[in-house]
């Protein structure tokens, strides 16, 4: 096809018109093509893919296909080039009969996303059908007496084509008797007739042969012929005549058999048999008409005898003959046109042309799910079909084309709420009463990974006993995902982190599918009390979603640590301790104190002490405190007692089963004058340089005790003056022992009552006021220590960097140990509230700090309180421990500083009360007096690291 373009304004107008037309066609989603009928296979129709705006490469992936109701196979599309072509023979007369318009309606459907395009292919008529007469020969009998201009009806020809191709012209072969009458303008009347132009004479021409030719208007012209054989008859001059030559009748479809259509009436001017008329159908009518109607030969009534269906035929033409009974019968003719009226007798036809299922729950609004075709064989209002959808569903019907509806998404979907919809589409016509049809479709909602796995609670607490076997199952986490299939497959994993210096995965693991949590190694309560970690649950969707849950695994203590004795010094052999006791001591004199710690917690760390019976069943004058570990005399010593005693002290915890440790104490009874000359802390079997050090220490201790005595006297005098000068401050109760302990960080006092100030009691200094140095330094450093004592009191010290918690001491902070001495213990564990002694400083300031009791003291750490120094000092961090701390029930301070193996024996580990010790007390008490005076003036400071 070639186009020639003009110039100027006309060209621009034409181009604009074509663009507007193309835009209108694209907006309606409809294309129009035309093709001639009887086109050969492969005939080009149109470039349908290009006209629809589709790329050739996407035709196959998007499942490009063509659908046509009842017209399948006539047209096809080449998916390689997108061309619509003729696939099989197209016969317009077969498709549309004699309809003026004939089109093939195609639906072009592509998926991903679903789109529907409507294509109309007009079938152009060609002149491929010649005119056809009902018969090839027609016989007519005409009396010679018929007058001129008599008319004899003929059945015209029919042409299956339309338009000019079906426009017929007739011509009669040349003759002198008859001429041809043109058919009337009424298109329903197809007949024509012969007009007698010259009188007939049987004797001259008994038979006349004529040829009637019908020619259509096509190019080239096609013709059809019929031979007319006219026989000339004698007699009977008048033929029957009907009232009208054409009758028109309206008849409803579906009327019952026997319904009267019309009653015809013909008359004959003759008399007798020549005037009797017999009615019949012409031989030229079709068998279909004869099967639908019947005529009574006497009355001329036409009645229904077959099923009348408007959808089958909208009208019927009946040719009726009236023939008289003369010897030479004459006939008259008329035409009856029966127009069938439509009745609403057909239900709508509903069909799903294409379904795009299932639909994703995140599909956008307006997504086309299905294409629905509706039709009704009735006409007019009876054939007007409307569709409706089930209410309260997130879908709607949209009319996209004549008799086509699209099922589209109207609101958001949520598969977790509704996973499938049962939709019912109802098609209803406009008749009265209306008829309807329904069709149902199940729409499944495809899952989208829009829900993360969820745990029942955000945190779980798990209790696991320590020393569990490796691979032990300790807990199971479970998460639920509201999605389906792969999106609901949950896998579990650890959120990796560091636990101390080790990775979390070295402690626990989680099974990816079951969620079972396993302990990979035995857990140790003393090393790790709480293991807190997170487990991630992640689904298998794309992209995957996940959530976390926190597990707090508390490691429960088991009695897996035996009590550990605190050795008097590092490198001591055998744990045996030698003590020198004067013969003159009385009842209750404390000989020594056995100290032990247990790395466990609770009852497993609650220690008790028992004195094992001696060999031979001999009674010994000693006992041990059940919970204090203090070895004291049970009576006054006499000469019947053995001079040497080997005491075995059994230290036992309260676990199940109980674990024990044994301490050996060697007690030697000496005269009072000999006691200072012997070492009260020598180990059994000590020889060599150790013995020489003991002799040197004796002289140093004597010197220190002398100085201490002066300090004690000064302190007593000062205290007496204070008590007499300030009577309102409260008197000191006689006999109430007060312990003042001085150390490098200040002075601490211990009493069973809280007092605003420290004052000495009445009675001997040994029982009223005792001052001790927490430890004796090496002889080479003792003079330096005496010189720096005052400086230590005046300025705070930094935390001692040369000590750390041991595992046993850390665990000891969780022990629950009760004291039995000095009215300290009131109830056992789990019983009523316990009254514990309070260690407080001499300062009266209310803002003094508080800390927990010292580790290893055998006292519940929740019951003791230290108060010392002004202000609110910093609390100790984990792993920090003061250099020295006080053991209740014993005038001593434990030092846990690690000393070299060759250092002086630690005098604070095991304590005796000989004269040598009394001398030391006096010296230390003087230092304590000075310290207390500084505290009362508010000038003392406390080291924060000793909390």
Swiss-Prot record:
- What InterPro entries is this protein classified in? Cadherin-like_dom (IPR002126), Cadherin-like_sf (IPR015919), Cadherin_CBD (IPR031904), Cadherin_CS (IPR020894), Cadherin_N (IPR013164), Protocadherin/Cadherin-CA (IPR050174)
Membrane topology reported for the UniProt record: Single-pass type I membrane protein
Ranges occupied by PXXP repeats: 734-737, 774-777, 796-799, 829-832, 870-873, 888-891
Topological domains, Cytoplasmic: 719-947
What are the disulphide bonds in this sequence? Answer: 96-102
Q: Which Gene3D superfamilies match?
A: Cadherins (2.60.40.60)
Which segments does the topology annotation call Extracellular? 30-697
Name any one Pfam family assigned in the record. Cadherin_tail
- Bilayer-spanning residue ranges: 698-718
* Biological process, per Gene Ontology: cell adhesion; homophilic cell adhesion via plasma membrane adhesion molecules; nervous system development
State its location(s). Answer: Cell membrane
The record's listing under CDD domains reads:
Cadherin_repeat (cd11304)
| Segments of this protein annotated with the region Required for interaction with FYN | 738-947
Q: Does the keyword Transmembrane apply?
A: yes
Glycosylated residues? 139, 257, 265, 548
Stretches the record annotates as Disordered: 754-805, 828-853, 868-947
Q: Domains: what does the record tell us?
A: Cadherin 1 to cadherin 4 domains mediate homophilic trans-interaction, the interaction with an identical protocadherin expressed by a neighboring cell. This is a head-to-tail interaction, the cadherin 1 domain interacting with the cadherin 4 domain and the cadherin 2 domain interacting the cadherin 3 domain of the other protocadherin. The cadherin 6 domain mediates promiscuous interactions with protocadherins on the same cell membrane. Each cadherin domain binds three calcium ions.
Q: What does this protein do?
A: Calcium-dependent cell-adhesion protein involved in cells self-recognition and non-self discrimination. Thereby, it is involved in the establishment and maintenance of specific neuronal connections in the brain.
Q: Report what the protein is called.
A: Protocadherin alpha-4
> What species is this protein from?
Homo sapiens
């Amino acid at each position: 096809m070639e186009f020639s373009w003009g110039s100027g304004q006309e060209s621009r107008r034409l181009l604009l018109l074509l663009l507007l037309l193309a835009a209108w066609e694209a907006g309606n989603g409809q294309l129009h093509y035309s093709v001639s009928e009887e086109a050969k296979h492969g005939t080009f129709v149109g470039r349908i893919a290009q006209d629809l705006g589709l790329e050739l490469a996407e035709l196959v992936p998007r499942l490009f296909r063509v659908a046509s109701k009842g017209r399948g196979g006539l047209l096809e599309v080449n998916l390689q080039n997108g061309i619509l072509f003729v696939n099989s023979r197209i016969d317009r007369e077969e498709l549309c009969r004699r309809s003026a318009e004939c089109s093939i309606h195609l639906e072009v459907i592509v998926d991903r996303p679903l789109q529907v395009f409507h294509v109309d292919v007009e079938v152009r008529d060609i002149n491929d059908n010649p005119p056809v007469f009902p018969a090839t020969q027609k016989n007519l009998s005409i009396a010679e007496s018929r007058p001129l201009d008599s008319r004899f009806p003929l059945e015209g020809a029919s042409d299956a084509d339309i338009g000019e191709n079906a426009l017929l012209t007739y011509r009669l072969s040349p003759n002198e008797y008859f001429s041809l009458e043109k058919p009337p303008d009424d298109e329903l009347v197809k007949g024509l007739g012969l007009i007698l132009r010259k009188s007939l004479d049987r004797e001259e021409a008994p038979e006349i042969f004529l040829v009637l030719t019908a020619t259509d208007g096509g190019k080239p012209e096609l013709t059809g012929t019929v031979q007319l054989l006219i026989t000339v008859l004698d007699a009977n001059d008048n033929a029957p005549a009907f009232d009208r030559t054409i009758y028109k009748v309206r008849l409803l479809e579906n009327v019952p058999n026997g319904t009267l259509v019309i009653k015809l009436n013909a008359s004959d001017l003759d008399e007798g048999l020549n005037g009797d008329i017999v009615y019949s159908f012409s031989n030229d009518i079709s068998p279909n008409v004869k099967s639908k109607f019947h005529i009574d030969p006497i009355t001329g009534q036409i009645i229904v005898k077959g099923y009348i269906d408007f959808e089958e035929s909208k009208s019927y033409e009946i040719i009726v003959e009236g023939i008289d009974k003369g010897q030479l019968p004459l006939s008259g003719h008329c035409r009856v046109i029966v127009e069938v009226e439509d009745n609403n007798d057909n239900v709508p036809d509903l069909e799903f042309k294409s379904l795009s299922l299932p639909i994703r729950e995140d599909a956008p609004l307006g997504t086309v799910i299905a294409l629905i075709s509706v039709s009704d064989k009735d006409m007019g209002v009876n054939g007007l079909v409307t569709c409706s959808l089930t209410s309260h569903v997130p879908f709607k019907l949209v009319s996209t084309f004549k008799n086509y509806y699209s099922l589209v998404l109207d609101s958001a979907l949520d598969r977790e709420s509704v996973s499938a919809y049962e939709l019912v589409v109802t098609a209803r016509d406009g008749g009265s009463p209306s008829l309807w049809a329904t069709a149902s479709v199940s729409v499944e909602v495809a899952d989208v990974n829009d829900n993360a796995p969820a745990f029942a609670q955000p945190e779980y607490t798990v209790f696991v006993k320590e020393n569990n076997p490796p691979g032990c199952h300790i807990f199971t986490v479970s998460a639920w995902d509201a999605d389906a299939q792969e999106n609901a497959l949950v896998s579990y994993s650890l959120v990796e982190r560091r636990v101390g210096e080790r990775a979390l995965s070295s402690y626990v693991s989680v099974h990816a599918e079951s969620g079972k949590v396993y302990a990979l190694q035995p857990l140790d309560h003393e090393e790790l009390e709480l293991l807190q970690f997170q487990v991630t649950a992640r689904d298998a969707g794309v992209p995957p979603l996940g959530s976390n849950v926190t597990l707090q695994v508390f490691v429960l203590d088991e009695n897996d640590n035996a009590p550990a004795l605190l050795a008097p010094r590092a490198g001591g052999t055998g744990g045996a301790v030698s003590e020198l006791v004067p013969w003159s001591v009385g009842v209750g004199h404390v000989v020594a104190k056995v100290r032990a710690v247990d790395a466990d917690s609770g009852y497993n760390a609650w220690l008790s002490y028992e004195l094992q019976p001696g060999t031979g069943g001999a009674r010994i004058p000693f006992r041990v405190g059940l919970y204090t570990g203090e070895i004291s005399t049970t009576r006054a010593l006499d000469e019947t007692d053995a001079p040497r005693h080997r005491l075995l002290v059994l230290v036992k915890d309260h676990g199940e089963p109980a674990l024990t440790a044994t301490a050996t104490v060697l007690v030697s009874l000496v005269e009072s004058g000999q006691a200072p000359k012997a070492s009260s802390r020598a180990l059994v079997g000590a020889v060599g340089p150790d013995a020489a050090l003991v002799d040197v220490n004796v002289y140093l201790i004597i010197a220190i005790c002398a100085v201490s005595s002066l300090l004690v006297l000064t302190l007593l005098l000062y205290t007496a003056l204070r008590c007499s000068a300030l009577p309102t401050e409260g008197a000191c109760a006689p006999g109430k022992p007060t312990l003042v302990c001085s150390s490098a960080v200040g002075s601490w006092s211990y009493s069973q009552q809280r007092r605003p100030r420290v004052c000495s009691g009445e009675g001997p200094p040994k029982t009223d006021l005792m001052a001790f140095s927490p430890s004796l330094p090496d002889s080479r450093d003792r003079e330096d220590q005496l010189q720096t004592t005052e400086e230590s009191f005046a300025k705070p010290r930094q935390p001692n960097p040369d000590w750390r918690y041991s595992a046993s001491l850390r665990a000891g902070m969780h022990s629950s140990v009760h004291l039995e001495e000095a009215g300290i213990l009131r109830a056992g564990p789990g019983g009523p509230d316990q009254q514990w002694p309070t260690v407080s400083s001499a300062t009266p300031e209310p803002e003094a700090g508080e800390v927990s009791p010292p580790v290893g003291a055998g006292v519940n750490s929740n019951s003791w309180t230290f108060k010392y120094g002004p202000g609110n000092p910093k609390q100790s961090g984990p792993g920090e421990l003061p250099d020295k701390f006080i053991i209740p029930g014993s005038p001593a301070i434990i030092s846990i500083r690690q000393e070299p193996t060759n250092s002086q024996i630690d005098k604070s580990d095991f304590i005796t009360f000989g004269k040598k010790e009394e001398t030391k007390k006096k010296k230390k008490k003087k230092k304590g007096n000075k310290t207390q005076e500084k505290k009362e003036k508010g000038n003392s400071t406390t080291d924060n690291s000793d909390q």
